[in-house]
Swiss-Prot record:
Residues 33-522 are cytoplasmic. This is Cytochrome P450 714C2. Belongs to the cytochrome P450 family. Probably not involved in gibberellin metabolism since over-expression of CYP714C2 in a heterologous system does not induce semi-dwarfism. The lineage of its organism: Eukaryota, Viridiplantae, Streptophyta, Embryophyta, Tracheophyta. It is a single-pass type III membrane protein. Its cofactor is heme. The keyword Metal-binding applies. It comes from Oryza sativa subsp. japonica (Rice).
């Protein structure tokens, strides 16, 4: 007796063919194509951990991280928390693999093949490469699309060139000089609220500074770039912060095809936030266009709106251009600066001699006068403190690039599609570059500038490297100098006993449990 009739076989044939095609697609995308790429690099002596099918090295990364977490918990309290290398707990697999495979090695997260680089010569070539064939990883537009889209942080080719021409001039130092007064206004609003808190509590008060600094930085971005106050864009900042946290939880799933399309609770939350942020930004831009029709005010939002009307939009719409670039500015412009300010205050609170030195310099140079750009330029010790903070706690965790075509770097033929990552925190704490005190807070290392602090100087990269260096670094540095110099002139502060040193990766490296400080008015 036949198990299946011919009609039943015909009915089963389409799903069988579909399964075969699906398996073939998965096999080609997740194994055959990546394996060919890996083989090209292995043939040139590039080594790395053996990947598994479907998930690459993700299972091994999780195993190493769990072991590191257990070891860290056992050692808690036995080491100086300020001299410990948080890379060992946040990215322990990078440390492990670098010890096994050296300063250039290959690993995999699903379909994404990553060449991890800390070799100074290779970093220099990356920094000097001006070819558009070396761009931002394509996965960023897909996996981080809700947060970054195809804005200036993630786009490539002609679209990125256009975005850079539109946005970068608004953040040149000549424009930033004119923003000092509005930075002072935003900072004084925050500091006055702290002053009231200290007075209400009898001369000393514990303040968790993180959210205050986010509000301050968001206020600066709103006023300087979008012609509004923080209150008008508050909902956008809140939702972008929620989106950042949600996407950080998915960081290890990057490269697993289809994971972002699954209707999981996390993905549904991300989709809803993305939709809400898009609506809010478009509403602000429409209101801005209506209001500015009778005004001559020209700021960054004006430039973005104008740029949306004449760009190379084969890969995105004018509305996408506005939304994605505004999201990039909102996120990068306030989150990274506020995080650096929080780390800076933590380090000054735990190193009183440097707090005193920076305060004396600030009071001596300012002499009660309102801040201006010339005064800020003379604050050498404060600049050194900021530079050292950016070294120990860089706002960006990685320099991420992708070979958009076959190319050669560092004597290696890089196949198209290879991602190239520089783990900035590892490079910034490398004893062979920074000396035996690489993990210690020592602003004096920058006394003779970056070139005097490390050899070679291109290994210092808090704002990235090469042509894709952060366009907003001038704004960030001036903003940090303004808020820190004003704060130092009004308060002395120390770490609260409630402070827990717990760096966390949420797309940026930030204080995981906040920075509570005890303030006393001078």
């Amino acid at each position: 007796m036949e198990l299946f009739s011919s009609q039943q076989w015909l009915a089963l044939l389409p799903p069988i063919i579909l399964c075969i095609l699906l398996f073939s697609y998965v096999y080609i995308i997740l194994w055959l194509r990546p394996e060919r790429l890996r083989q090209k690099l292995r043939s040139q002596g590039v080594r790395g951990p053996k990947p598994s099918f479907l998930f690459g090295n993700i299972p091994e990364m999780r195993r190493i991280q769990q072991l590191a977490k257990s070891a860290h918990e056992q050692e808690a309290g036995s080491t100086d928390m300020f001299s410990s290398n948080y890379v060992a707990t946040l990215f322990p697999y990078f440390l492990h693999w670098s010890r096994v495979y050296g300063s250039i090695y290959l690993y995999s997260t699903g379909s994404i093949q990553v060449l991890n680089v800390t070799d100074p010569n290779m970093v220099k070539e990356l920094a000097n490469c001006k070819s558009l064939d070396l761009g931002k990883p394509c996965y960023l537009q897909k996996e981080r699309g809700a947060l970054l889209g195809m804005g200036i942080l993630t786009s490539n080719g002609d679209l990125w060139v256009h975005q850079r021409k539109v946005i970068a001039p608004e953040l040149f130092m000549e424009r930033v000089k004119g923003m000092v007064n509005l930075m002072m206004e935003a900072a004084m609003s925050m500091l006055n609220s702290w002053k009231n808190e200290v007075e209400d509590r009898g001369g000393s008060a514990e303040i968790v500074v993180d959210e205050f600094l986010r509000t301050f930085s968001a206020d600066v971005i709103s006023r300087a770039c979008f012609g509004s106050s923080f209150s008008e864009g508050k909902e956008i900042f809140i939702k972008i912060r929620q989106l950042q946290k949600a996407m950080a939880k998915q960081s290890m799933l990057i490269g697993v095809p289809g994971s972002r399309y699954l209707p999981t609770r996390s993905n549904r939350g991300i989709w809803n936030l993305d939709s809400s942020i898009r609506t809010l930004i478009l509403n602000i831009s429409k209101k801005y266009e209506h209001d500015s029709s009778t005004s001559v005010n020209k700021d960054l939002l004006h430039s973005i709106i104008q740029g949306s009307k004449d760009g190379p939009f084969a890969s995105c719409t004018p509305e996408d251009f506005i939304v994605d670039n505004c999201k990039n500015i909102y996120f990068a412009g306030h989150e990274t600066t506020s995080t650096t300010a929080a780390w800076c205050l933590m380090l000054l609170a735990s190193h009183h001699e440097w707090q005193s030195r920076a305060r004396v310099e600030s009071l001596d140079i300012c002499q009660g006068r309102p801040l201006d750009f010339d005064i800020l330029r003379k604050l050498k010790k404060l600049t050194m403190v900021i530079q050292e903070t950016l070294r120990l706690y860089p706002p960006a965790s990685f320099v991420a690039r992708e070979a958009l075509n076959d190319m050669k770097l560092g004597g290696i033929d890089i196949p198209k599609g290879t991602n190239i990552w520089i783990p900035i925190a590892m490079a910034h704490r490398d004893p062979s570059v920074w000396g035996p005190s690489a993990d210690k807070f020592d602003p004096d290392r920058f006394a003779n500038g970056i070139a005097g602090a490390c050899k070679p100087p291109h290994m210092y990269m808090p704002f990235g490297v090469g042509v894709r260096t952060c366009a907003g670094q001038n704004l960030a540095m001036v903003e940090l100098k303004v808020v820190l110099s004003l704060l130092l002139s009004k308060f002395e502060f120390k770490l609260s006993p409630n402070y827990v040193h717990c760096p966390a990766f949420r797309l940026t490296i930030e204080p995981g449990k906040g920075v509570p400080l005890i303030f006393r008015e001078l």
